[in-house]
Amino acid sequence: MLFRSLQPALEEFQPAKSVSLNEDELVIARNYFLLTMKPTIYAANVNEAALSATSDSEQLRAIREVAASEGAECIVICAQLEADLVGLDAEEQREYLESLGVKSSGVDQLIKSAYRMLGLMSFLTAGEKEVRAWTIPQGSRAQDAAGAIHSDIARGFIRAEIVSYDDLIGARTYATAREKGLLRLEGKDYIMQEGDIVNFRFNV
């Protein structure tokens, strides 16, 4: 039954996800792990001139139309530019992108798009020697986020001291952020937000 439903679309080179399936067929389809049932991100590799152009080329418009027809995102990326950025520090990267009229690198956009598609987000922990990003599902509680670091932190969870990335960058130091009341204490059921910087208080 499933493959009879899918056959006409596949013979026309249309993705399996374009076919409207009932609940029973969807359950069966998941067992086959069909590639064209999976969500898609289109990445269009262009040159630097096209990246900073005020209008899309005919080819790029066609890719965007295909992506839109599938409800997918289209990320425009310049592989040569990304290779050049690797050898630059953060400030040089920012200046280079600004000179091209580009807000963020294609790789950054691709990562963010993948996170959105997979329902993921990240939070940060920051110490004197290390800043680290942790990946968790969107909608995770603070205690679940603590468990992403270590099960003992989740088990002995007391409070989470949190400041947003933007607030800390604006304040420049933890001390200033604390003076301005930007740091806050949250309980285990706090829903984590993208870019939260967290210090977990725990006892085991």
State where each predicted segment sits.
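Phosphate-interacting basic helix/loop segments used at nucleotide- and nucleic-acid interfaces
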Residues: 21-28
